[in-house]
Amino acid sequence: MLCMAVAVMGGLASCEEHTDEYEGSLKVGNILLADNSIVSPQGYDSKNQTAVGVIFYASRDTALVVSRYELGSYAYADSLGTVGSVNSDSRTLCGAENTAALLVSEITTPAAEAVADFRSPMASWALPSAGELRALAAMLPVVAHSMEIIGGEPFADGQYISSTQDGSTSESEQMYYLSVAMPSGFVTSTIKTTPGRVRPVLRLR
């Protein structure tokens, strides 16, 4: 992996260092708008503003937004096999890096391709890593409240597909990806050809 893991709060790790462009407004539950600005739920004007998603994780060097839209249910891959350069740590915030690796893999990756085809005012959406989905689950009540305010699609109870492979063994890395349950955040090893719910995330730098 080209990315280096560094410790951040909550027992999660970030793949690389980032710089904030939104200092002062990076707060879980705040809303990302189509014009690249951020507002609080109280300051959101549905008649004059277009919401893109809701911040579900914010720290000194990383902020992550979850889309207002579900994309449906897709398989991690159409066949079994290890995808190179995909981080297999269930704690890391590496959705963007993992998605990039999936998209250039020789293995067809329907979930990552669905995210790549997602039409939005913002670019660079990713299939979230297991660590990112765990972070989302931890803050789901706050995020769901803001999502309701902006008219976003509710989060389903059940398994969401992550971009993370199960790296327990070389065999498991070939066969399984990690899915994360909402709202519990419970992580499960799932056969790569088994579909899971897809909800894109976006990293703010």
Region locations from a protein language model:
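Bacterial N-terminal signal peptides that target proteins for export
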Residues: 1-2
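Short, compositionally biased
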Residues: 15-121, 192-205
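Secondary-structure transition/turn motif
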Residues: 68-71, 180-184
